[in-house]
Design a protein with these regions (language model features):
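Conserved PLP-enzyme active-site core in the AAT-like
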Residues: 11-14, 18-32, 37-174
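N-terminal "arm"/small-domain region of PLP-dependent enzymes with the aminotransferase-like
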Residues: 1-2, 160
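Phosphate-rich ligand and nucleic-acid binding surfaces
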Residues: 5
């Protein structure tokens, strides 16, 4: 029997079992492993799929990378996989002015460096119009303002993709 480290995630066992069963039939083999081996690998798959999607209409040129990404800074609890030195490295463009990765971090409150300053974040959304917004942290002290950001994203043109890597809080949500 599998051991799930987060409470409230037992349903994942059922989903994984169904997937394993279907993959065994599809591949015609007795054993398959359908789980990714790490958060880095999982987020690499997401970032790769996004770059593939934004380049779907032009396969002749060098693929365009994600123009701007907004995330939690690693020092403020952000996960390594969503950083330019992590899985995001090969999928984010460079800012033509600074020549650094085109990543803007969520601003935080002056009196609490681990809590997002939502009004300031909304202003940055309007300024940068990131293609991808990554929520989720390795160090969780406060809940992420998913609903507030989602409402603001609907007003952007083009609309940003909101990704919530909830691996560390899934058991609390589930």
């Amino acid at each position: 029997a599998e051991i799930f480290y987060y409470q409230g995630t037992e349903f994942i066992d059922q989903v994984e079992s169904l997937l394993v069963e279907q993959m065994r039939l599809f591949l015609g083999c007795p054993e398959v492993e359908t789980r990714v081996i790490s958060g880095q690998m999982a987020n690499t798959a997401v970032f790769s799929a996004m770059v593939d999607y934004i380049n779907r209409t032009d396969r002749r040129r060098e693929p365009r990378r994600l123009s701007w990404v907004m995330n939690n800074h690693i020092i403020r609890g952000g996960h390594l996989s969503a950083q330019p030195m992590g899985a995001l490295r090969d999928f984010v463009a460079r800012d033509p002015i600074t020549e650094k990765p085109a990543v803007v971090n969520f601003p935080v409150l002056k009196d609490n460096p681990y809590k997002m300053d939502v009004p300031a974040a909304l202003a940055l959304l309007e300024e940068y119009k990131p293609e991808l917004i990554v929520l989720g942290k390795s160090m969780i002290i406060h809940k992420e303002p998913v609903a507030e950001l989602r409402r603001a994203i609907k007003e952007l043109s083009p609309e940003s993709i909101l990704m919530y890597d909830m691996a560390h809080v899934l058991g609390l949500i589930g």
